[in-house]
């Protein structure tokens, strides 16, 4: 969250709400009935953590309202009655959801004006383009969204319920093979950090596995909060490989490369060339080193041989949805 015209968000915190597991345990802490974001994260040992956004779509409005309240009051510290608000939504978000969002903004927060933009479209704007296909992969959901001259093509948008949370779960699972047990919601956050620090995408998965077996070149150490140091090797690239091979976690779905290709094939034949040449990665789950090269290699193998393929991975892509929103909301034409 932040202000239009800024080049980076002022507030970045996880969309989690924590409710105390036992009431009245924390003596003298002036116990709240709910904690949001980083505070929920740091007190996670005594809380039950919940994600009000599932697969990119809000499923728990009470908790979502708490997150918005926290954003206005504690993070941005602005009077919400005085500021127009730009919110974003997942592609193919149900209409009822958008209406509920609008209702809460006007009735609970009394905002003067609001607009709801599609996340992937904002990412494309942030990359300086108006035509291209965006692969947006966050924590709960991934989407491929073809956009032509500023407009998303809804018939060709594809959704993949595979994203950051599943990669963290996968890493938790494969760490147990090494005898490292991570199970609680608190421990999951440790594994998420490990994933963000150490995971990468292999250009050739099988070859990388052979390398990992025969040498220790891919091994890295990771220090846990209690000081214990663990070593991970092949787990580093096995974790995000699921994005390309969902069958590894028992999902019957096409990988992100094939989903992107399928999305392009649902578009008019005349615009495919523009899409192949402007494949833009966006979202936290596209931050793995090596992902753009792998994506390029896989799509080149699927596309017609003469086709020029370009995969763009902007360095700020973790926040490119926000940056696109900042650009859009600061245009004078938009404010009218």
Curated annotation (Swiss-Prot):
Which keywords does this chain's UniProt record carry? ATP-binding, Cytoplasm, Cytoskeleton, Hydrolase, Nucleotide-binding
* Reactions it catalyzes: ATP + H2O = ADP + phosphate + H(+)
Q: Name one GO molecular function term.
A: ATP binding
Q: Which SUPFAM superfamilies match?
A: Actin-like ATPase domain
Xref: Gene3D superfamilies = 3.30.420.40, Actin, Chain A, domain 4
Catalytic activity, EC: 3.6.4.-
Q: Name one GO cellular component term.
A: cytosol
Provide the protein's localization: Cytoplasm, Cytoskeleton
GO BP terms: namely:
cell division
The domain of life for this entry's organism is Eukaryota
* Alphabetical list of InterPro entries matching this protein: Actin, Actin/actin-like_CS, Actin_CS, ATPase_NBD
Read off the SMART domains from this record: ACTIN
Further comment found in the protein's record: There are at least 7 different actin genes in tobacco.
The task this protein performs is described as:
Actins are highly conserved proteins that are involved in various types of cell motility and are ubiquitously expressed in all eukaryotic cells. Essential component of cell cytoskeleton; plays an important role in cytoplasmic streaming, cell shape determination, cell division, organelle movement and extension growth.
The record's comment on protein family reads: Belongs to the actin family.
> What name does the UniProt record give this protein?
Actin-103
Q: Which organism is it from?
A: Nicotiana tabacum (Common tobacco)
């Amino acid at each position: 969250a932040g202000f239009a015209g800024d080049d980076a968000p002022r507030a970045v915190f996880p969309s989690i709400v924590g409710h105390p597991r036992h009431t009245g345990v924390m003596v003298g802490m002036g116990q709240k009935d709910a904690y949001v974001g980083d505070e929920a994260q740091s007190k996670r040992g005594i809380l039950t953590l919940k994600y009000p956004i599932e697969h990119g779509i809000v499923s728990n409005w009470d908790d979502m309202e708490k997150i918005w309240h926290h954003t206005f009051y504690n993070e941005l510290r602005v009077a919400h009655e005085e500021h127009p608000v730009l919110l974003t939504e997942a592609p193919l978000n149900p209409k009822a959801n958008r209406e509920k969002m609008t209702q809460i903004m006007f009735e609970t927060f009394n905002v003067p004006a609001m607009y709801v933009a599609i996340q992937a479209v904002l990412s494309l704007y942030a990359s300086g383009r108006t035509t291209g296909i965006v692969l947006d992969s966050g924590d709960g959901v991934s989407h491929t969204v073809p956009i032509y001259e500023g407009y998303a093509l809804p018939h060709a948008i594809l959704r993949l319920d595979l994203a950051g949370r599943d990669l963290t779960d996968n890493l938790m699972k494969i760490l147990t093979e090494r005898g490292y047990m991570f199970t609680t919601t608190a421990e999951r956050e440790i594994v998420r950090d490990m994933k963000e620090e150490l995971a990468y995408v292999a250009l050739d998965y099988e070859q990388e596995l052979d390398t990992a077996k025969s040498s220790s070149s891919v091994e890295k150490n990771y220090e846990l909060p209690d000081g214990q140091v663990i070593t991970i090797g092949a787990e580093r690239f096995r974790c995000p490989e699921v994005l390309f091979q969902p069958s590894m976690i028992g999902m019957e779905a096409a990988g992100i490369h094939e989903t992107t290709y399928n999305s392009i094939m649902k578009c008019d034949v005349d615009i495919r060339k523009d899409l192949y040449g402007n494949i833009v990665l966006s979202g936290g789950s596209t931050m793995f080193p090596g992902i753009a090269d792998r994506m390029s290699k896989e799509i080149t193998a699927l596309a017609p041989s003469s086709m020029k393929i370009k995969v763009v991975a902007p360095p700020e892509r973790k926040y490119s949805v926000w940056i696109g929103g900042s650009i859009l909301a600061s245009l004078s034409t938009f404010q009218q």
